[in-house]
């Protein structure tokens, strides 16, 4: 299976820069997109041979996730079942025959770590969601986790320490 996960940071701009050419060229079985920044009806992608699943944020121009897959899933879930989080369009889950595929755009803690408490609540709730899925069958998680695990993951680790996504 060929799976591509990509934070597009605005799908409309990405389409203008050749997304569809890339999409056709790589011919992946599954595309998981994060930070689509779309509202329903803002874009109509013609992707023959793919099923499309979109989760939009209520806030215009904010977050959003999507999965395009050649194989139709058994079921689809949007969000993680926690109202506090689900209005931001951060998760799409496909139930395939042998596994769950979860596309996620994890919240950023923001400058000055203003949203760190929310992020920690998100982490607990998302972990519980994944553990619940894992009790039934395997889970594949892909997406933008908004975290740098080690200094090597950052261009400027010293100046980024204690910034969103890189805290002790």
Please provide the spans of the model-predicted regions:
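Active-site-proximal beta-strand elements of phosphoester/diester hydrolases
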Residues: 1-9, 98-110, 142
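Active-site beta-strand/loop signature of hydrolases that rely on acidic residues for catalysis
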Residues: 7, 23-41, 101, 130-151
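Conserved CoA-thioester-binding segment of acyl-CoA-metabolizing enzymes
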Residues: 17-20, 117-127
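Surface-exposed cleft-lining segments at the edges of enzyme active sites
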Residues: 81-82, 107-123, 158-163
């Amino acid at each position: 299976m060929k799976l591509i996960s990509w934070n597009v940071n605005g799908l409309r701009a990405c389409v203008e820069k050749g997304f569809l050419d890339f999409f056709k060229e790589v011919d992946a079985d599954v595309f998981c997109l994060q930070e689509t920044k779309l509202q329903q009806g803002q874009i109509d992608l013609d992707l023959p041979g793919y099923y499309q699943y979109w989760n939009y944020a209520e806030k215009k121009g904010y977050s959003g996730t999507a999965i395009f897959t050649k194989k139709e899933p058994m079921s689809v879930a949007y969000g993680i079942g926690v109202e506090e989080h689900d209005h931001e369009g951060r998760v799409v889950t496909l139930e395939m025959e042998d596994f769950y595929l979860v596309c996620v755009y994890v919240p950023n803690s923001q400058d000055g770590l203003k949203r760190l408490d929310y992020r920690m609540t998100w982490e607990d709730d998302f972990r519980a969601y994944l553990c619940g899925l894992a009790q039934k069958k395997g889970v594949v998680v892909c997406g933008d986790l908004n975290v740098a695990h080690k200094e090597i993951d950052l261009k400027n680790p010293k100046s980024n320490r204690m910034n969103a996504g890189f805290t002790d």
